[in-house]
């Protein structure tokens, strides 16, 4: 037939049986990939340190999605929260991976069956005997079924009525666990960080989908609308389906990058805006201030800061620090975090506490500047030592650590003080193991960054696909120069069935 690569899908244009077959095969590929990817990730995943080496530092992509839906245990005997389990049952990580692979195999067989037995009675128009699909009716059926699934997820799975619930955490990603969620029916349900909105929105959207599906099953479209929107043309379905997919892709790119209850930081890592706004730094200082108000010493107050919270306040966990072509996990970049060294407090010889100005997200290098509590520059690491007035040596800066591994240790020699000042630009200071994975020291993005980039990119491409196929179906008669209602369609790409020798042709 000699079709160019970009037109090969026209072979299923007027062939409902094989159109169904290729879609079932596509589902087989997607499900098979998901199951296989899950098994691969489980093979390389190290669950031993959920605090300093969580799934998102290891570059896991599908494990976080399973976890947010309620899967926490492995047949390997470990739990995502760090404990051990004895009988995880079928709904473990491996169980879910296996069910996807089994489902993929069944879809593969179903696709072959439908490819071989393509000429089914159900696809024929009773009056004409030609292949035909009642697209408005099919739309109603799919809308109804999608509504049932949506309602069921919100009313049963999320609420724990029949299911595990979903991953819920505190605003600082410290206490996350899978739990049942009650629907939020008030204004708070529209807050993207309130988990109850997930339940209520699925229940509401599912109800709407069920009602809309029943409407489209019981009410036929007016003839003018049917013809105007080309409801009899399968390319109309393609165009509107692409629209639904690219819209969803744009939405999830936003909820992933900006953060929401659906993308917990314990599973996908923090967002770049939490670094930009000093989100974790403010919480750490608030906790230290509260500790001091309770008559704790500075050392005791800092020692009470959870290592998990301190680790979030480190620029290496900012998903915007990765480069576009830097493949690999965060652990392959700056290394595997081993321990928190503690919080360094810098002071000049007058005893003023100095604060290192932190590196903004999009800088690779940044001057080391130390300011006092009023924001006045008191010390720096100069570029030109001959002209310096505020060098660490001249100002007499010292550093003392509170909390962490170096708790109570102080340094006054300039070389060491400058080393820790430079590291303080990057947030809290951690010991990182770069030898195990041969990490190169160059920051990588988290799965949050990869997911956002992929979905935003494909959403843009699919947007153009929607425009392209929408224009083709709306203006088919103009483009082809024929009346779409003619019985004999002989223009290329508009045969009743591609390659069908029975299509009437004009005499040469």
Curated annotation (Swiss-Prot):
Superkingdom of source: Eukaryota
GO BP terms, alphabetized: photosynthetic electron transport in photosystem II
One GO cellular component term: photosystem II
Membrane topology, record value: Multi-pass membrane protein
Entry note: cofactor: Binds multiple chlorophylls. PSII binds additional chlorophylls, carotenoids and specific lipids.
Protein's UniProt keywords contain Transcription: no
Locations listed in the record: Plastid, Chloroplast thylakoid membrane
Disulfide links within the chain: none
Keyword Zinc applies: no
Pfam families in UniProt: PSII (PF00421)
Gene Ontology molecular function terms on file: chlorophyll binding; electron transporter, transferring electrons within the cyclic electron transport pathway of photosynthesis activity
UniProt-listed SUPFAM superfamilies: Photosystem II antenna protein-like (SSF161077)
Transmembrane annotation, as ranges: 21-36, 101-115, 140-156, 203-218, 237-252, 457-472
Keyword annotations of the record: Chlorophyll, Chloroplast, Chromophore, Membrane, Photosynthesis, Photosystem II, Plastid, Thylakoid, Transmembrane, Transmembrane helix
Record-stated family: Belongs to the PsbB/PsbC family. PsbB subfamily.
Quaternary state and interactors: PSII is composed of 1 copy each of membrane proteins PsbA, PsbB, PsbC, PsbD, PsbE, PsbF, PsbH, PsbI, PsbJ, PsbK, PsbL, PsbM, PsbT, PsbX, PsbY, PsbZ, Psb30/Ycf12, at least 3 peripheral proteins of the oxygen-evolving complex and a large number of cofactors. It forms dimeric complexes.
Function, in words: One of the components of the core complex of photosystem II (PSII). It binds chlorophyll and helps catalyze the primary light-induced photochemical processes of PSII. PSII is a light-driven water:plastoquinone oxidoreductase, using light energy to abstract electrons from H(2)O, generating O(2) and a proton gradient subsequently used for ATP formation.
Protein name: Photosystem II CP47 reaction center protein
Source organism of this protein record: Triticum aestivum
Taxonomic classification: Eukaryota, Viridiplantae, Streptophyta, Embryophyta, Tracheophyta
């Amino acid at each position: 037939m000699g079709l160019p690569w970009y037109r090969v899908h026209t072979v299923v244009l007027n062939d409902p049986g094989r159109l169904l077959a290729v879609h079932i095969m596509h589902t087989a590929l997607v499900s098979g990939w998901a199951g296989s990817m899950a098994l691969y990730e489980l093979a390389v995943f190290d669950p031993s340190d959920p605090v300093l080496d969580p799934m998102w530092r290891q570059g896991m992509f599908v494990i976080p999605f399973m976890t947010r839906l309620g899967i926490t245990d492995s047949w390997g005997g470990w739990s995502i929260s760090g404990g051990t389990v004895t009988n995880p049952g079928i709904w473990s990580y491996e169980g879910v991976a296996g069910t996807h692979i089994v489902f993929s195999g069944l879809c593969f067989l179903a696709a072959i069956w439908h490819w071989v037995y393509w000429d089914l009675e159900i696809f024929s128009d009773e009056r004409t005997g030609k292949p035909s699909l009642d697209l408005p009716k099919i739309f109603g059926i799919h809308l109804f079924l999608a509504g049932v699934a949506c309602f069921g997820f919100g009313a049963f799975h999320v609420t724990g009525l029949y299911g595990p619930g979903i991953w819920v955490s505190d605003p600082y990603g410290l206490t996350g666990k899978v739990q049942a969620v009650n629907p939020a029916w008030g204004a708070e349900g529209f807050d993207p960080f309130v988990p109850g909105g997930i339940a209520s929105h699925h229940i509401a959207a599912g109800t709407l989908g069920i009602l809309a599906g029943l409407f489209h099953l019981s009410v036929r479209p007016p003839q003018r609308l049917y013809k105007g929107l080309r409801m009899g043309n399968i390319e109309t379905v393609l165009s509107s389906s692409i629209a639904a997919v690219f819209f969803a892709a744009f939405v999830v790119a936003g909820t992933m990058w900006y953060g929401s209850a659906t993308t917990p930081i314990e599973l996908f890592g923090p967002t770049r805006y939490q670094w930009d706004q000093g989100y974790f730094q403010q919480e750490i200082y608030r906790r230290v201030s509260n500790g001091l108000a309770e008559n704790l010493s500075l050392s005791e107050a800092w020692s009470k800061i959870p290592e998990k919270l301190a680790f979030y306040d480190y620029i290496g966990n900012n998903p915007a620090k990765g480069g576009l072509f830097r493949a690999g996990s965060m652990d392959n970049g700056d290394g595997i975090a081993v321990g928190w060294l503690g919080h360094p407090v810098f002071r000049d010889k007058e005893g003023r506490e100095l604060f290192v100005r932190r590196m903004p997200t999009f800088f690779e290098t940044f001057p080391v500047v130390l300011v006092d509590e009023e924001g006045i520059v008191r010390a720096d690491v100069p570029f030109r030592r001959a002209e310096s007035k505020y060098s660490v040596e001249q100002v007499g800066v010292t550093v003392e650590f509170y909390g962490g591994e170096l708790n109570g240790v102080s340094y006054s020699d300039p070389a060491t003080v400058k080393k820790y000042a430079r590291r303080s630009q990057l947030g809290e200071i951690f010991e990182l193991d770069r030898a195990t994975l041969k990490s190169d020291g160059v920051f990588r993005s988290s799965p949050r960054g990869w997911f956002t980039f992929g979905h935003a990119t494909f959403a843009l491409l699919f947007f153009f696909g929607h425009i392209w196929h929408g224009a083709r179906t709306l203006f088919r008669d103009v483009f082809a120069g024929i009346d779409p209602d003619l019985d004999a369609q002989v223009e290329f790409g508009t045969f009743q069935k591609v390659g069908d020798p029975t299509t009437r042709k004009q005499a040469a």
